[in-house]
């Protein structure tokens, strides 16, 4: 039987070099992995800032927040890929870049929504100011309306009006039933109810106002809610 020749051992300097190369490559891979984890944390931080800035703006902005939630799910999937050593650094970087672009687009959409909201608020303030100026010129007419309808409107501060009803309580026609309407945001809010009403009733009436913008119907229903409370 023919005996195969034995290969000579590698020179010691080559063996040493290969070991050093393994160490260097391991360190480089660990640094890259740490950078990926840091990048993920940076993306999450940006998303968190977006979420904080977008609170209480409008339904349109909420839809963008839902989009951000979807992006978080995608980032979570990337996290699993990092932990399981799946995928490549190039692919992760590409997908991360795509997510950053989408986050920036969501931010721009939020900024645009916020700008439109500010414009609407500015317009509403001008409208309120016009009403107040007109009311000064029409004091006799207002006094007549107050006496006829048993309702008056008082300016509280910017973006807030106080509505006062009388002639509701058959035992005390002078008794006042009042609330403050806050118009600072896109959706109206009712505050400082005197006397207090059932919260579910108020939410229902205000919800209809915000969806229909039918202000006369709103006044009719909130007045009726006060009358119903007297009978309870």
Swiss-Prot record:
Gene3D superfamilies named in the record: Chromosome segregation protein Spc25
Gene of this entry: SPC25
GO cellular component: Ndc80 complex; nucleus
Subcellular location per the Swiss-Prot or TrEMBL entry: Nucleus; Chromosome, Centromere, Kinetochore
Coiled-coil region: 27-126
Primary site of residence: nucleus
Function: Acts as a component of the essential kinetochore-associated NDC80 complex, which is required for chromosome segregation and spindle checkpoint activity.
Record note on quaternary structure: Component of the NDC80 complex, which consists of NDC80, NUF2, SPC24 and SPC25.
GO BP, sorted A to Z: cell division; chromosome segregation
Listed InterPro entries: Spc25, Spc25_C
Protein family according to the UniProt entry: Belongs to the SPC25 family.
Protein name, per record: Probable kinetochore protein SPC25
Record keywords, A-Z: Cell cycle, Cell division, Centromere, Chromosome, Coiled coil, Kinetochore, Mitosis, Nucleus
